[in-house]
């Protein structure tokens, strides 16, 4: 049995051009000498007032970044609608798209929380990252989205062979950055430091 894994690894500098040149510097919440966070607990993302409700139809022209398909019909993407970014889903091979959760990012108000890429770890585990200090994830196909905020910048997120989400977070320790590996066994609600190869 062979397992294929796709990984996007993007530098913080490259993200600036991907998301329109508006990257914000991370907010330092721990000193470099304190070391990486041991655990990160996500918070539930609630729908901001004035934003689209989950299940709202959005045009394919509003999609930015990548699209991820888990089969011939079902896929996920990020859309920019007005001043907000949303996760979106299709069940007809990309002919129509609907929002698949609350607004993940409000452009002006949440610059450090931007997302630029979307990925899927199966039918239910969907995650977005890149451009800020967060990984937004849903363990249940979009019914609930959770935000994990890291002290560094997530540069890659993938699903390991055990079905767990694995994130590589840039520690931003100067010219020579070191990525720290975190694992979530519950679809993005809780992350823990894990330096084993591929995550346990």
Residue ranges and their predicted role:
Residues 55-82:
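Beta-strand-rich domains and repeat architectures in extracellular enzymes and scaffolds
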Residues 35-60, 95-106, 143-151, 189-199:
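Trp- and S/T/G-rich repeat-edge/linker motifs of beta-rich repeat architectures
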Residues 15-36:
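C-terminal region of N-terminal signal peptides and the immediate post-cleavage residues
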Residues 1-10:
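N-terminal export and membrane-targeting signals
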Residues 72-77, 122-128, 163-167:
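Entry beta-strands of beta-propeller and related beta-repeat scaffolds
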Residues 90-91, 138-139, 184-185:
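Conserved Ser/Thr-centered positions that define the repeating blades of beta-propeller domains
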Residues 62-67, 108-118, 152-160, 199-200:
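Repeated scaffold domains used in trafficking and secretory/extracellular systems
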């Amino acid at each position: 049995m062979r397992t294929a894994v796709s990984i996007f690894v993007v530098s913080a500098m490259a993200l600036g051009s991907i998301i329109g040149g508006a990257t914000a510097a991370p907010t330092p919440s721990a000193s470099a000498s304190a070391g990486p966070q041991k655990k990160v607990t996500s918070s539930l993302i609630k729908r901001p007032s004035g934003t689209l409700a989950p299940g709202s139809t959005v045009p394919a022209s509003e999609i930015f970044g990548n699209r991820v398909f888990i089969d011939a019909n079902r896929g996920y993407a990020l859309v920019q609608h007005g001043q907000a970014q949303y996760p979106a889903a299709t069940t007809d091979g990309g002919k129509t798209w609907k929002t698949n959760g609350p607004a993940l990012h409000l452009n002006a108000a949440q610059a450090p929380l931007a997302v630029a890429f979307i990925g899927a770890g199966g039918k239910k585990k969907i995650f977005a990252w890149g451009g800020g200090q967060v990984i937004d994830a849903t363990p249940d196909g979009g019914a609930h989205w959770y935000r994990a905020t890291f002290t560094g910048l997530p540069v890659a997120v993938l699903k390991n062979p055990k079905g767990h989400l694995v994130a590589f977070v840039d520690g931003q320790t100067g010219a020579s950055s070191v990525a720290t590996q975190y694992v979530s066994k519950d679809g993005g609600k809780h992350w823990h430091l894990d330096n084993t190869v591929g995550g346990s």
